[in-house]
Amino acid sequence: ALIREGSVVEHLKTFEDIDYIIGSLEDKESLAKLVQDAEVLVHLAHFPGPVQTVEELIKVNIDGTFDLLEEARKAKVKQVIFMSSCLVFGEMLPTVNKDNPMDENHPVRPHNLYGSIKNSIEGFCFQFQKSRAFDITILRPVTIYGVRPQIDKSEWFQTIDYLATNYNVDLKGSTKYVSVDSVVQGIQCVLGNAEAAGKIYHLIDGHIHNLTLGKMIADTIDSFGECEGVMGDEGVPMSNQAAKEIGVEFKGEESIKEYIKLIHKLQGEYGGERNIQNW
């Protein structure tokens, strides 16, 4: 696994067979070491913003990924799995509706830098596949929720935290969601799967209004806090049928409730009410 200097890896200590290489997308030597003797490359890396300049974000992510794919080609890697994003989409065709949800064949017209970078990398991935360097599979998740090594960085943590201490919250907007379990399962389902070569899969479980989510949190943890705000838009209907057909399971809002319970439990075990030095 390629990790940055200072990456949190304590939660991975139980996995004894992981070899760590400290490096980055800018470091070609570390990229070459990463893919040496590897059969499959899972590309999750993204040089983060927003503190970096646009030029730096483009150079590191796009040029760095091209270097990574080139090193994979030299090392004769058999398969590359690239974690893209549904933010490659921007403008929606007028034909998209609940009966005809957006699928993997919908044209991409990203509206922001992150989506544009992911879209550019997808293009390079297909170029390498076309040249028969290796098989490529692209996964496009929406907002991923799951417990992070730094618990306060977990999705919806702040809302759960405020309601756990009986504060009122003001919520607006909405989000598409998928659990980290489904994302991992997506990787497992395409790993070594010849039928997935050259394919794109949407990883999306559902869509929820943040106000609805807040009320779900309050009910789940028996909070006295109140949720106020406005409902978000209904969102663009998206299809996850292709992912389901290869075996990915999406468990809906029941999975969110289990996640809320887990975050609430971990808050108590690792610091409780706002003792963040222990998170």
Label each residue range with its predicted role.
Residues 26, 56-67, 108, 112, ...:
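Glycine-rich NAD(P)-binding loop of the Rossmann-fold in SDR/ketoreductase-type enzymes
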Residues 253-279:
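Amphipathic terminal alpha-helices
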Residues 109-137:
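Active-site Tyr-X1-5-Lys
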Residues 67-113:
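Conserved Rossmann-fold NAD(P)-dependent oxidoreductase catalytic core, especially the SDR/UDP-sugar
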Residues 127-175:
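NAD(P)-dependent short-chain dehydrogenase/reductase
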Residues 119, 131-135, 145-157, 181, ...:
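Glycine/proline-rich active-site loop of Rossmann-fold NAD(P)-dependent oxidoreductases
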Residues 174, 186-240, 273-278:
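Mid/C-terminal beta-alpha module of Rossmann-like enzyme folds, strongest
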Residues 7, 18, 22-60, 71:
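NAD(P)H-binding glycine-rich loop region in Rossmannoid oxidoreductase-like domains
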